[in-house]
From Swiss-Prot:
It comes from the Eukaryota. The keyword Transmembrane applies. GO terms for biological process: xenobiotic detoxification by transmembrane export across the plasma membrane. This is Protein DETOXIFICATION 28. GO terms for cellular component: membrane. Keywords: Membrane, Transmembrane, Transmembrane helix, Transport. InterPro entries: MATE_euk, MATE_fam. It is found in: Membrane.
Amino acid sequence: MGERDDEAEGILEKAKIPLLKDQNVAEEENGEIKKEIWLETKKLWRIVGPAIFTRVTTNLIFVITQAFAGHLGELELAAISIVNNVIIGFNYSLFIGMATALETLCGQAFGAKKYDMFGVYLQRSWIVLFLFSILLLPMYIFATPILKFMGQPDDIAELSGIISVWAIPTHFSFAFFFPINRFLQCQLKNSVIAISSGVSLVVHIFVCWLFVYVLELGVIGTIATANVSWWLNVFILFTYTTCGGCPLTWTGFSMESFTRLWEFTKLSASSGIMVCLENWYYRMLIVMTGNLEDARIDVDSMSICMSINGLEMMVPLAFFAGTSVRVANELGAGNGKRARFAMIISVTQSLIIGIIISVLIYFLLDQIGWMFSSSETVLKAVNNLSILLSFAILLNSVQPVLSGVAVGSGWQSLVAFINLGCYYFIGLPLGIVMGWMFKFGVKGIWAGMIFGGTMVQTLILIFITMRCDWEKEAQNAKVRVNKWSVSDARK
């Protein structure tokens, strides 16, 4: 019996050995996956963290400018709000979009370690955006008749026209700020951008106080302060770049930057259209709401929801930047699988944050609403939109990240067509039908634009991303990098 027991124990021990090996392998694989997730998270947040800070501080320049103008009077506040949101806002989103061409080119070049191309890309972007800024000057010069044509009261339109002319220096600063911002971002020098934005904001607050309360320059003083702050930001980043901060990627000004401008313009334009179609879509939501019967309450409630949504969008837009850089870097390095992994990590983390924020907004909207209005009627209207606002925030936690994948992969033209179709041929008509034909008012307009536009666009982007052949995209990135290289341009 003893011998049989020993044999049985021996058999059991032998049977346990492969099980233990499998368990050890599984534990090792688990550990490797956790390590990979942690490493990718660190790389992602090295971009996302400073990007959130930068976006908040640059947007605060506009907010603080309006706040100082608001203390001068209702007319001044209305005029500078129109200039910031309509005149400057139109061009601001266009330049942001056009500068994302650098995220594709510089991001992939950085991954491929072809650093000599960076400086030429940056200079080409400066040239293209500067030419576009000249073409857009009539919007500032003829702001008064444009605003009157749009139905603005004469006094607001007249003052807005004067402010717009004084805002021209800010307009030109965008042509230099956004390209150099993307240039540094693709090299993971995000802390430099954040420091520059923080310094500019502090200076902006001080100069605003000086111009408005000490020198008593009025509303012109507030917009002049914005000019100082934006150009200070450009000066800091330009000095850092050209004075040794980027030794590998900046080798001085080059005549090569004047070559292949038409191809660069087409890529920049498709990037600009992709971003603008989305930005203008939400601006149209406010315009459409203004045509409802109880327009004042509806516009106020929708404006509050858009303000909350705009502040929350700083997070997914930072993930947009982080995703585009990470995907572009990995594709440029020929790592299709790692680009896919970077996309999954970014979407997952942004979605988790989006779920948390959307739930908090849903339950705390009453308290948050008091920050914007003390009117019980307006707050009740805002509360009625809580479900739509929460759902919009949830969708926005995914959609910009997928757009970042598109930018990192160079799909701007495709996404521009998707945005056009989803937003303006599906979402907008559906919003009109639900708002007016079915008498759902502002809830119908917004629901139609969310489910018909944003949701359909998000589903299409998810489908495209899931079907993507990442190894093929890595090959495409290699071809693109070689095509745009300085050495090729010289041949």
